[in-house]
Design a protein with these regions (language model features):
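Short alpha-helical oligomerization interface
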Residues: 90-102
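Active-site loop of short-chain dehydrogenase/reductase
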Residues: 75-76, 119-125
């Protein structure tokens, strides 16, 4: 039976390669990222298995986007949070550090907390 997988941050690198592995395994894959053209490129390659949702985890509508993707997939079995940034802040520039915190901490906590509760309610995941 095919899993329903969401990968947060799947437009390049590890996230994209994980998406391809799950697709090869026959799973349904929801991919997210900030670069819509890269999301659509993957969806065009595998239209029967890939759904997309373009958003930045630093935004205020993470849960709305996640719920939309879960609806498109018809459920959720696996979530992979692969979004992260790491810029050098030589002068301890708060604006730069704020972006890192919003992505690596706030976005992670919001999405993983929602997903944990979703899995607990459905009894698996």
């Amino acid at each position: 039976m095919a899993n329903k997988v969401i990968i947060i941050g799947a437009t390049s690198g590890i996230g994209l390669e994980l998406a391809k592995l799950y697709i090869k395994n026959g799973d349904m894959v929801g991919v997210t990222g900030r670069r819509n053209e890269l999301l659509l490129k993957l969806q065009l390659q595998f239209p029967a298995q890939v759904v997309t949702e373009c958003f930045d985890v630093r935004g205020n509508e993470n849960i709305l986007h996640l719920e939309s993707l879960i609806k498109k997939l018809g459920g959720l079995d696996i979530l992979i949070y692969n979004s992260g940034v790491g810029d050098i802040s030589k002068e301890l520039d708060w604006q730069l550090d704020k972006q890192t915190t919003q992505t690596n901490v706030n976005g992670f906590i919001e999405i993983v907390n929602y997903t944990f509760n979703y899995f607990a309610k459905q009894g698996h995941g």
